[in-house]
Design a protein with these regions (language model features):
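Membrane-embedded, hydrophobic transmembrane alpha-helices
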Residues: 1-100
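Membrane-interface transmembrane helices that cradle and orient dolichyl/undecaprenyl
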Residues: 238, 276-292
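Transmembrane-helix motifs of polytopic, lipid-linked glycan transferases
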Residues: 18, 78-88, 205, 214-237, ...
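Alpha-helical transmembrane segments of multi-pass integral membrane proteins
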Residues: 8, 12, 43-44, 191, ...
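Transmembrane signal-anchor helices characteristic of membrane glycosylation enzymes that use polyprenol
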Residues: 102-127, 138, 142-145, 151, ...
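Short acidic/glycine- and proline-prone juxtamembrane loop motifs at membrane-interface regions
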Residues: 255-269
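Short helix- or helix-capping micro-motifs
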Residues: 246-251, 278
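Interfacial juxtamembrane loops and adjacent helix segments
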Residues: 142-207
Length: 294
Protein backbone atom coordinates (compact mmCIF):
# COMPACT_ATOMS: atom_id res chain seq x y z
CA UNK A 1 0.00 0.00 0.00
CA UNK A 2 1.54 3.31 -1.06
CA UNK A 3 1.52 6.13 1.47
CA UNK A 4 0.39 9.50 0.16
CA UNK A 5 2.71 12.45 0.98
CA UNK A 6 -0.15 14.75 1.97
CA UNK A 7 2.04 17.77 2.73
CA UNK A 8 3.73 17.54 -0.67
CA UNK A 9 0.38 17.09 -2.40
CA UNK A 10 -1.06 20.10 -0.56
CA UNK A 11 1.93 22.29 -1.50
CA UNK A 12 1.74 21.12 -5.11
CA UNK A 13 -1.95 22.05 -5.35
CA UNK A 14 -1.41 25.46 -3.77
CA UNK A 15 1.64 26.17 -5.91
CA UNK A 16 -0.36 25.62 -9.09
CA UNK A 17 -3.59 27.32 -8.03
CA UNK A 18 -2.55 30.43 -6.08
CA UNK A 19 -0.47 32.09 -8.88
CA UNK A 20 -3.40 31.78 -11.31
CA UNK A 21 -5.85 33.04 -8.70
CA UNK A 22 -3.70 36.07 -7.85
CA UNK A 23 -3.05 36.90 -11.50
CA UNK A 24 -6.78 36.98 -12.28
CA UNK A 25 -7.37 39.16 -9.21
CA UNK A 26 -4.52 41.49 -10.20
CA UNK A 27 -6.03 41.98 -13.66
CA UNK A 28 -9.41 42.78 -12.07
CA UNK A 29 -10.95 40.22 -14.39
CA UNK A 30 -14.53 41.47 -14.73
CA UNK A 31 -15.10 38.93 -17.49
CA UNK A 32 -14.89 36.15 -14.86
CA UNK A 33 -17.50 37.43 -12.41
CA UNK A 34 -20.51 35.78 -14.03
CA UNK A 35 -18.77 32.48 -14.73
CA UNK A 36 -19.61 29.38 -12.72
CA UNK A 37 -17.36 28.84 -9.70
CA UNK A 38 -16.02 25.57 -11.12
CA UNK A 39 -15.20 27.27 -14.43
CA UNK A 40 -13.30 30.03 -12.63
CA UNK A 41 -11.31 27.40 -10.73
CA UNK A 42 -10.40 25.73 -14.01
CA UNK A 43 -9.20 29.01 -15.55
CA UNK A 44 -7.12 29.90 -12.49
CA UNK A 45 -5.55 26.44 -12.36
CA UNK A 46 -4.80 26.55 -16.09
CA UNK A 47 -3.10 29.94 -15.78
CA UNK A 48 -1.12 28.61 -12.82
CA UNK A 49 0.06 25.64 -14.91
CA UNK A 50 1.21 27.93 -17.74
CA UNK A 51 3.02 30.20 -15.26
CA UNK A 52 4.75 27.28 -13.56
CA UNK A 53 5.81 25.77 -16.88
CA UNK A 54 7.85 28.89 -17.64
CA UNK A 55 9.14 29.11 -14.06
CA UNK A 56 10.32 25.50 -14.04
CA UNK A 57 12.05 25.90 -17.40
CA UNK A 58 13.82 29.04 -16.15
CA UNK A 59 15.06 27.31 -13.00
CA UNK A 60 16.16 24.21 -14.91
CA UNK A 61 18.15 26.29 -17.40
CA UNK A 62 19.92 27.91 -14.42
CA UNK A 63 20.57 24.41 -13.02
CA UNK A 64 18.69 25.48 -9.87
CA UNK A 65 15.72 23.13 -10.13
CA UNK A 66 15.00 22.02 -6.57
CA UNK A 67 12.60 22.39 -3.65
CA UNK A 68 14.28 25.46 -2.10
CA UNK A 69 14.37 27.39 -5.40
CA UNK A 70 10.81 26.44 -6.38
CA UNK A 71 9.31 27.22 -2.96
CA UNK A 72 11.24 30.50 -2.75
CA UNK A 73 10.06 31.47 -6.25
CA UNK A 74 6.44 30.71 -5.32
CA UNK A 75 6.70 32.75 -2.12
CA UNK A 76 8.33 35.72 -3.88
CA UNK A 77 5.95 35.72 -6.85
CA UNK A 78 2.78 35.18 -4.81
CA UNK A 79 3.90 37.68 -2.16
CA UNK A 80 4.56 40.31 -4.84
CA UNK A 81 1.20 39.68 -6.52
CA UNK A 82 -0.61 39.85 -3.17
CA UNK A 83 1.04 43.17 -2.36
CA UNK A 84 0.31 44.65 -5.81
CA UNK A 85 -3.33 43.51 -5.76
CA UNK A 86 -3.89 43.92 -2.01
CA UNK A 87 -6.93 46.19 -2.53
CA UNK A 88 -8.71 43.61 -4.67
CA UNK A 89 -8.02 40.42 -2.73
CA UNK A 90 -10.96 38.26 -1.77
CA UNK A 91 -10.75 34.87 -0.12
CA UNK A 92 -12.56 32.35 -2.36
CA UNK A 93 -15.48 30.69 -0.61
CA UNK A 94 -16.49 27.10 -1.27
CA UNK A 95 -20.06 28.16 -0.54
CA UNK A 96 -20.12 29.42 -4.12
CA UNK A 97 -19.80 25.79 -5.21
CA UNK A 98 -23.46 25.07 -4.63
CA UNK A 99 -24.70 21.70 -5.78
CA UNK A 100 -26.61 21.74 -9.03
CA UNK A 101 -26.98 19.22 -11.82
CA UNK A 102 -24.01 20.83 -13.58
CA UNK A 103 -21.85 20.38 -10.49
CA UNK A 104 -23.01 16.79 -10.00
CA UNK A 105 -22.25 16.01 -13.65
CA UNK A 106 -18.75 17.47 -13.35
CA UNK A 107 -18.01 15.55 -10.15
CA UNK A 108 -19.27 12.31 -11.73
CA UNK A 109 -17.11 12.97 -14.79
CA UNK A 110 -14.03 13.49 -12.60
CA UNK A 111 -14.73 10.31 -10.65
CA UNK A 112 -15.06 8.30 -13.87
CA UNK A 113 -11.81 9.72 -15.23
CA UNK A 114 -10.02 9.06 -11.94
CA UNK A 115 -11.12 5.43 -11.95
CA UNK A 116 -9.83 4.92 -15.49
CA UNK A 117 -6.66 7.04 -15.36
CA UNK A 118 -5.37 6.44 -11.81
CA UNK A 119 -3.23 3.41 -12.70
CA UNK A 120 0.14 4.81 -13.82
CA UNK A 121 2.65 2.55 -15.53
CA UNK A 122 4.33 0.01 -13.27
CA UNK A 123 7.08 -1.02 -15.69
CA UNK A 124 8.96 0.90 -18.38
CA UNK A 125 11.48 -0.09 -21.05
CA UNK A 126 14.66 1.83 -20.27
CA UNK A 127 15.17 2.95 -23.89
CA UNK A 128 11.48 3.75 -24.47
CA UNK A 129 10.17 7.33 -24.68
CA UNK A 130 8.18 6.96 -21.45
CA UNK A 131 11.27 5.87 -19.53
CA UNK A 132 13.34 8.70 -21.00
CA UNK A 133 10.81 11.26 -19.78
CA UNK A 134 10.51 9.59 -16.37
CA UNK A 135 14.24 9.06 -15.81
CA UNK A 136 14.91 12.59 -17.03
CA UNK A 137 12.43 13.94 -14.48
CA UNK A 138 13.97 11.92 -11.65
CA UNK A 139 17.45 13.02 -12.67
CA UNK A 140 16.28 16.64 -12.85
CA UNK A 141 14.78 16.42 -9.34
CA UNK A 142 18.00 14.84 -8.05
CA UNK A 143 20.59 17.14 -9.65
CA UNK A 144 18.63 20.29 -10.52
CA UNK A 145 19.98 20.25 -14.08
CA UNK A 146 18.69 19.16 -17.47
CA UNK A 147 22.12 17.68 -18.21
CA UNK A 148 23.96 14.69 -16.76
CA UNK A 149 27.65 15.18 -16.06
CA UNK A 150 29.04 11.77 -16.92
CA UNK A 151 32.34 11.04 -15.08
CA UNK A 152 33.23 8.23 -17.48
CA UNK A 153 32.75 10.51 -20.47
CA UNK A 154 34.88 13.19 -18.82
CA UNK A 155 37.77 10.73 -18.47
CA UNK A 156 37.78 9.79 -22.17
CA UNK A 157 39.75 11.45 -24.92
CA UNK A 158 38.07 11.93 -28.26
CA UNK A 159 40.08 9.05 -29.70
CA UNK A 160 38.97 6.73 -26.89
CA UNK A 161 35.39 7.91 -27.20
CA UNK A 162 35.19 6.94 -30.83
CA UNK A 163 36.02 3.37 -29.81
CA UNK A 164 33.38 3.00 -27.06
CA UNK A 165 30.56 5.22 -28.28
CA UNK A 166 28.27 4.91 -31.27
CA UNK A 167 26.55 7.51 -33.43
CA UNK A 168 22.83 8.06 -33.22
CA UNK A 169 20.46 7.77 -36.19
CA UNK A 170 20.67 10.52 -38.82
CA UNK A 171 23.73 11.99 -37.16
CA UNK A 172 21.94 12.95 -33.94
CA UNK A 173 25.12 12.89 -31.87
CA UNK A 174 27.13 10.29 -29.97
CA UNK A 175 25.61 7.96 -27.42
CA UNK A 176 26.75 5.52 -24.74
CA UNK A 177 23.27 4.20 -23.91
CA UNK A 178 20.34 2.91 -25.90
CA UNK A 179 17.54 5.42 -26.24
CA UNK A 180 17.64 9.18 -26.56
CA UNK A 181 20.62 9.92 -24.30
CA UNK A 182 22.89 12.04 -26.45
CA UNK A 183 26.41 13.47 -26.30
CA UNK A 184 26.61 16.49 -28.57
CA UNK A 185 30.27 17.46 -28.24
CA UNK A 186 33.50 16.61 -26.42
CA UNK A 187 34.06 20.03 -24.88
CA UNK A 188 31.50 19.52 -22.10
CA UNK A 189 31.08 15.96 -20.74
CA UNK A 190 27.30 16.12 -20.71
CA UNK A 191 24.73 13.47 -21.49
CA UNK A 192 21.54 15.15 -22.68
CA UNK A 193 18.11 13.55 -22.54
CA UNK A 194 16.20 13.64 -25.81
CA UNK A 195 12.57 14.54 -26.48
CA UNK A 196 10.69 17.52 -24.99
CA UNK A 197 11.69 19.40 -21.85
CA UNK A 198 8.23 20.34 -20.56
CA UNK A 199 7.07 16.82 -19.70
CA UNK A 200 10.38 16.20 -17.95
CA UNK A 201 10.01 19.41 -15.94
CA UNK A 202 6.60 18.43 -14.61
CA UNK A 203 7.81 14.92 -13.88
CA UNK A 204 10.65 16.46 -11.90
CA UNK A 205 8.25 18.73 -10.00
CA UNK A 206 5.98 15.82 -9.05
CA UNK A 207 9.02 13.79 -8.02
CA UNK A 208 10.22 16.55 -5.71
CA UNK A 209 6.89 16.86 -3.90
CA UNK A 210 5.51 13.31 -4.09
CA UNK A 211 8.57 11.08 -4.31
CA UNK A 212 9.89 9.00 -7.20
CA UNK A 213 6.58 7.21 -7.74
CA UNK A 214 4.86 10.60 -7.88
CA UNK A 215 6.63 11.35 -11.15
CA UNK A 216 4.40 8.79 -12.84
CA UNK A 217 1.27 10.77 -11.96
CA UNK A 218 1.91 13.66 -14.35
CA UNK A 219 0.03 11.98 -17.21
CA UNK A 220 -3.08 11.01 -15.16
CA UNK A 221 -3.33 14.52 -13.67
CA UNK A 222 -3.07 16.29 -17.02
CA UNK A 223 -5.41 13.71 -18.54
CA UNK A 224 -7.98 14.83 -15.97
CA UNK A 225 -7.29 18.49 -16.78
CA UNK A 226 -7.82 17.78 -20.49
CA UNK A 227 -11.17 16.08 -19.84
CA UNK A 228 -12.37 18.99 -17.69
CA UNK A 229 -11.15 21.48 -20.31
CA UNK A 230 -13.06 19.71 -23.07
CA UNK A 231 -16.17 19.71 -20.89
CA UNK A 232 -16.02 23.49 -20.44
CA UNK A 233 -15.03 24.08 -24.07
CA UNK A 234 -17.97 22.07 -25.40
CA UNK A 235 -20.30 23.80 -22.99
CA UNK A 236 -19.11 27.22 -24.12
CA UNK A 237 -19.14 26.47 -27.85
CA UNK A 238 -22.39 24.51 -27.91
CA UNK A 239 -24.50 23.32 -24.97
CA UNK A 240 -24.12 21.69 -21.57
CA UNK A 241 -25.15 18.31 -22.99
CA UNK A 242 -22.64 18.43 -25.85
CA UNK A 243 -19.82 19.42 -23.50
CA UNK A 244 -20.64 16.53 -21.18
CA UNK A 245 -20.95 14.04 -24.05
CA UNK A 246 -17.62 15.10 -25.57
CA UNK A 247 -15.85 14.82 -22.22
CA UNK A 248 -17.35 11.38 -21.50
CA UNK A 249 -16.38 10.08 -24.94
CA UNK A 250 -12.84 11.35 -24.46
CA UNK A 251 -12.66 9.72 -21.02
CA UNK A 252 -13.83 6.36 -22.35
CA UNK A 253 -11.55 6.46 -25.38
CA UNK A 254 -9.05 3.60 -25.25
CA UNK A 255 -6.17 5.74 -26.55
CA UNK A 256 -6.88 8.35 -23.87
CA UNK A 257 -6.88 5.73 -21.11
CA UNK A 258 -3.67 4.17 -22.44
CA UNK A 259 -1.74 7.43 -22.71
CA UNK A 260 -3.08 8.74 -19.39
CA UNK A 261 -1.24 5.89 -17.69
CA UNK A 262 2.16 6.42 -19.34
CA UNK A 263 4.62 9.25 -18.52
CA UNK A 264 4.53 10.61 -22.07
CA UNK A 265 3.96 14.18 -23.26
CA UNK A 266 0.61 13.53 -24.99
CA UNK A 267 -1.61 14.31 -21.97
CA UNK A 268 0.28 17.49 -21.12
CA UNK A 269 0.11 18.64 -24.74
CA UNK A 270 -3.58 17.78 -24.96
CA UNK A 271 -4.44 19.62 -21.74
CA UNK A 272 -2.59 22.77 -22.82
CA UNK A 273 -4.03 22.66 -26.35
CA UNK A 274 -7.62 22.28 -25.12
CA UNK A 275 -7.01 24.92 -22.45
CA UNK A 276 -5.62 27.35 -25.02
CA UNK A 277 -8.55 26.72 -27.35
CA UNK A 278 -10.94 27.29 -24.44
CA UNK A 279 -9.30 30.60 -23.46
CA UNK A 280 -9.28 31.70 -27.10
CA UNK A 281 -13.00 30.93 -27.35
CA UNK A 282 -13.68 32.84 -24.15
CA UNK A 283 -11.61 35.76 -25.43
CA UNK A 284 -13.56 35.82 -28.71
CA UNK A 285 -16.77 36.05 -26.71
CA UNK A 286 -15.63 38.58 -24.09
CA UNK A 287 -12.58 40.37 -25.52
CA UNK A 288 -10.58 40.53 -22.29
CA UNK A 289 -7.10 41.88 -23.08
CA UNK A 290 -5.11 39.72 -20.63
CA UNK A 291 -7.20 36.72 -21.51
CA UNK A 292 -6.10 37.09 -25.12
CA UNK A 293 -2.43 37.05 -24.04
CA UNK A 294 -2.88 33.80 -22.17
Amino acid sequence: MLSIPWLGLFCLLLGNFIPGYLLTILWDADWMHDLAFSERLYIQLLIGVVFNSWLLLFLAELESFGLPAILLSWVLVCGSLMWIGRHHLQVPSLRQLWLSWKTVELIALLLLACILFAHPAESLLVFDDAAIYFLGGVQLAKTGSLFVRDPILASLSQEQGVQVLFTGPLGTGWSRYWGQFFIWDWIRPWVIFGLLHLQRLWCGLFTLFLGVYGGLWVAPVFGLLAVVGLYFLGRRLFTQEIGLLAAVLLTLNFVQIWLARLPLSEMLTQALFIGGFYLFTLWMQRRGMWLGIW
